[in-house]
């Protein structure tokens, strides 16, 4: 068996299958490596075995060696423990970002290099370019599928060793390629949601690790209107799962989460989807990371996303002395959520990002006792 020049992360899905197929057409020695990042907990919801069988089948069709690595221990310590700690603190984390940084482009990369590979390839919808002596992370050609948001924590050494073979493809084109190439995954549905939860109920899953703690649901005036099983089960702007029945003297309209008081275990709701209590024009972030290793300037204009697939929002970025980032948006943003990722763009280029720490949304600012100043950026 020849030493592979490139190891492809084969997930058992159509995207990684076509990524492997494209590389196979180039004639370089390649191999597939399947990562198991979550141990089967006996619930019957883990699809890892089905995905592994599909990955083996794809490797067989393409005539490339198949390898397997179990990274469930690394995932637990590097991703899942952080996930639980963030929810316990009342924040809403983004485990996919951390998984890419800590597992897929760290432990997987190490495993590929141990096999003798020079580079790795994955089925992400993103692109890499080398300009001005630096590696740049670019959006995928299919804007609806673009995954640069989840890859913004990657650095120069990782990008230098990474290929994104399907980054220039539209999803419809990719499906056609998979079908015409006879890949067994050509009609397989895309995976959705958090990988370790699968099709399970999120609240039931989280309740295994964070016991329910009943508290009050209040309106913005502080009137008690219902009970909740735990503030950590909810995120800002959420409508589903509140289970608020008819409230005397209130319209029969949906309720939305507008604030969480973690210390008092109180959830605040409003019937206005676009409540002023959910609006913010400023945010403070932490753990900033720049793809090229440094920000473009101490203060600069760009666009931002505070959640995946959000339209680009024009903003001004102010890099603080401690490396944290403050952002001023040109227009108010709805339900900007602490714990989620702020990702910054200059056109098609992903500059980097950070973790949202606080905003100037009125109720959240009051509950957090924030000293955040909207006078920092003029």
Curated annotation (Swiss-Prot):
Stored InterPro entries: MnmA-like (IPR004506), MnmA-like_C (IPR046885), MnmA-like_central (IPR046884), MnmA-like_central_sf (IPR023382), Rossmann-like_a/b/a_fold (IPR014729)
GO molecular function, one term: tRNA-uridine 2-sulfurtransferase activity
Taxonomy, superkingdom: Bacteria
Keywords: ATP-binding, Cytoplasm, Disulfide bond, Nucleotide-binding, RNA-binding, Transferase, tRNA processing, tRNA-binding
One GO CC term, this protein: cytoplasm
Binding-site list for ATP: 9-16, 35, 123
Sites marked Interaction with tRNA: 124, 340
Active-site positions on this chain: 99, 195
Chain spans, region Interaction with target base in tRNA: 94-96
EC annotation from Swiss-Prot or TrEMBL: 2.8.1.13
Location(s), subcellular: Cytoplasm
Bridged cysteine pairs (disulfide): 99-195
Reaction equations catalysed: S-sulfanyl-L-cysteinyl-[protein] + uridine(34) in tRNA + AH2 + ATP = 2-thiouridine(34) in tRNA + L-cysteinyl-[protein] + A + AMP + diphosphate + H(+)
UniProt-annotated stretches for the region Interaction with tRNA: 145-147, 307-308
Enzyme class: transferase
One GO BP: tRNA wobble position uridine thiolation
Family, per entry: Belongs to the MnmA/TRMU family.
PANTHER family: MITOCHONDRIAL TRNA-SPECIFIC 2-THIOURIDYLASE 1 (PTHR11933:SF5), TRNA 5-METHYLAMINOMETHYL-2-THIOURIDYLATE -METHYLTRANSFERASE (PTHR11933)
Reported function: Catalyzes the 2-thiolation of uridine at the wobble position (U34) of tRNA, leading to the formation of s(2)U34.
Protein name, UniProt field: tRNA-specific 2-thiouridylase MnmA
Species whose genome carries this gene: Xanthomonas oryzae pv. oryzae (strain MAFF 311018)
